[in-house]
């Protein structure tokens, strides 16, 4: 349902962007609920979204990952949050530290318990989510086209964030010089 009356929307174009952003917020929350709910079903009641995502990334391609690789893969600028999630995963015995190629490089890999839990997660995902998605995404290329559009929009929002940050810093410097 379009958001007709919003301080964010003074033109039709702005209205479309506002509606898109509200839809994106709903999608983001639904995605978070899905990941957390499915993760809890496999025995990780204490895990949040980032914990679950970090576990999946560590398992991805079955190779050990560094904190910077995990952060990059998740497009996170806060490695300390990833590090905290890894500590939780270590405590839960889902991941373990392994030596990296460089002397000071620490990497993480899934343990047998982490492997079992990610396998159960994948089974639930197949049985529930994939089945539902397949019921309305049978059109050839639908998911690929959707992924391409989401990737482009992620880039647009990343660029907008950089520009907003830069513009704010310039404005702050200008204001400081005037005073």
Where are these regions (language model features)?
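Pre-recognition alpha-helix immediately N-terminal to the DNA-recognition helix
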Residues: 23, 53-57, 116
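N-terminal helix-turn-helix DNA-binding core of bacterial DNA-binding proteins
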Residues: 36-77
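Residues within the DNA-recognition helix of helix-turn-helix
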Residues: 85
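Charged, amphipathic alpha-helical coiled-coil/dimerization segments
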Residues: 88-144
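N-terminal leader segment of winged-helix/HTH proteins
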Residues: 1-45, 94
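Helix-turn-helix DNA-binding helix
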Residues: 81-82
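Terminal interaction helix/tail motif
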Residues: 123-179
